[in-house]
Amino acid sequence: MKKSTLIQSIIIALLLVATVSVYTQNMSLKKKVEKFEASTKTREGNLKRFDTLDFIGWSGKNIKVFDDIHASDVHVEGTMSANDLAKHSNDAQSYFKFLKEGDGVVSHPVKLADGDWTAVIGETRSTVPDTAAGAAIGATTKKKGFMLTLAKWSDGKIKEEYVFSLNGDANNSFLNKYIK
């Protein structure tokens, strides 16, 4: 074989190897981008569902929306703890009786999502009368409060929920033991 033919063969082989390598890297990068986009879509969807939960389900006292967003075996810790949707839903309906028109979550100044988790701070407006004090939420004459909700999602539903509330009366707040 001539020296020039050998050099041409080596160059062609190197070009083929380089082409395959670039193609493989592009496919790997494409898969990473697709995975990132899917993850972003999931995170954004969970945050949107959480907005729906707070603004329509909770503040709008819409128990159907409230129930649809929680898993049937939801585990809840915080102001109203529960180990299933039936109890969580009943607790919510009991609390709804004390919410006046315009009470509830009025904004989400902070919303974060990572993987299957969301962390949302909700600004609340409500006046809970003394007659509701037995509901573990504490009575308050304050109009403004905050809630931090950490939620773990599975298939578009909340599977675990951890609610920390500061309703204007720090002495009655579940959140109080974490603020020092």
Residue ranges and their predicted role:
Residues E44, I63-W117, A139:
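A solvent-exposed, acidic/Ser-Thr-rich amphipathic alpha-helical stretch
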Residues G122-D155:
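Exposed beta-sheet edge and beta->alpha loop/turn motif
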Residues V22-D68, S72, I179-K180:
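Short, low-complexity N-terminal intrinsically disordered segments enriched in polar/charged residues
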Residues A92, V106-L112, F146-K152, Y162-V163:
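Hydrophobic/aromatic beta-strand elements that line small-molecule binding cavities or substrate pockets
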